[in-house]
Amino acid sequence: MGKLENASWIHDPLMKYLNSTEEYLAHLCGPKRSDLSLPVSVAYALIFLVGVMGNLLVCMVIVRHQTLKTPTNYYLFSLAVSDLLVLLLGMPLEIYEMWHNYPFLFGPVGCYFKTALFETVCFASILSVTTVSVERYVAIVHPFRAKLESTRRRALRILSLVWSFSVVFSLPNTSIHGIKFQHFPNGSSVPGSATCTVTKPMWVYNLIIQATSFLFYILPMTLISVLYYLMGLRLKRDESLEANKVAVNIHRPSRKSVTKMLFVLVLVFAICWTPFHVDRLFFSFVEEWTESLAAVFNLIHVVSGVFFYLSSAVNPIIYNLLSRRFRAAFRNVVSPTCKWCHPRHRPQGPPAQKIIFLTECHLVELTEDAGPQFPGQSSIHNTNLTTAPCAGEVP
């Protein structure tokens, strides 16, 4: 997330005589501290507190509640883990560099770690969002197939591939980064000038950024958009069909509410990550920097940084706002002994019609219009039918 260079983008062939090393270093690298350090740091601190607490709660409720251990929620768990990595490991480095643009004190290993971390979580996040969208598409459009194939064991295998691919594809950008020193005209290194930046030819960096932005943002978001469009058509078609009292029905309210929540998650994800990729692509396509271009880039860079970290904090808020089941799980984890923190049981309504959840193992997830369910509650009312556990699942 850090800038590759600062004032050195703009080549000054008539470098004037400077009286001190500090002035010379400031001429080469720009100011040591960003003008927006204080307000951005305050924003980052708020995002850090909300994001860490929220994502820890997400992980806890999924781990502790058996009813939430579904394939879709495993992907959301992966997304929460990547958000925690960014907030706990990436944000402190970002704040430090905001107040001390140079020197970089953590050496080559710290530089490699920083670059690999941001690249890995960037790729893992978009791949997790893509996989959960594909799972939702299969559950909506091909429910029988989802019942047979969408298992927790399969989700774990896919997540292993997601993180493995993310680490592998982070290596190209990581390998071209390193510690770079500024030099005096006589060739000696300027003290305190170490920065973590690109050390290979810039065309290599530009090519990597353009390729990864296409493979890990433009292409996945296009696929996700198509999938949610098809899901919307299917849900709209189902709503237009007249209810058949004899036919077996799918629990459409739950299916629709889960899809709505995931759609909002994807939409917010796209909004938050678009500035990040605009920032990277902007830098990669500019060949000759001017003061106006540098000013525009610096503005985009600050905005992209705030939105990048904001994306790591908003997901738990989305779950809490749009998922009754998740709100109940939150309350159960935060204050399990507080009787006022849990919703009262609703009065028993009229008998419900017989409903079979054709994709029960997949669709009973974070959201449920019928209210929160925990172990001991039943999803089928007034019916003698029983449901068998999904293949590969624990009852």
Swiss-Prot record:
Disordered, as annotated region: 374-395
Chain ranges on the Cytoplasmic side, renumbered to this chain: 63-74, 139-157, 234-257, 315-395
GO molecular function: GTP binding; intracellularly calcium-gated chloride channel activity; neuromedin U binding; neuromedin U receptor activity; neuropeptide receptor activity
Keyword Cell membrane: yes
Segments on the Extracellular side according to the record's topology features: 1-41, 96-115, 179-212, 279-293
Key words of the record: Cell membrane, Disulfide bond, G-protein coupled receptor, Glycoprotein, Membrane, Receptor, Transducer, Transmembrane, Transmembrane helix
PROSITE patterns named in the record: G_PROTEIN_RECEP_F1_1 (PS00237), G_PROTEIN_RECEP_F1_2 (PS50262)
Gene3D superfamilies, sorted: Rhodopsin 7-helix transmembrane proteins
The protein's role, per its UniProt record: Receptor for the neuromedin-U and neuromedin-S neuropeptides.
Protein name: Neuromedin-U receptor 2
The species this protein was found in: Rattus norvegicus
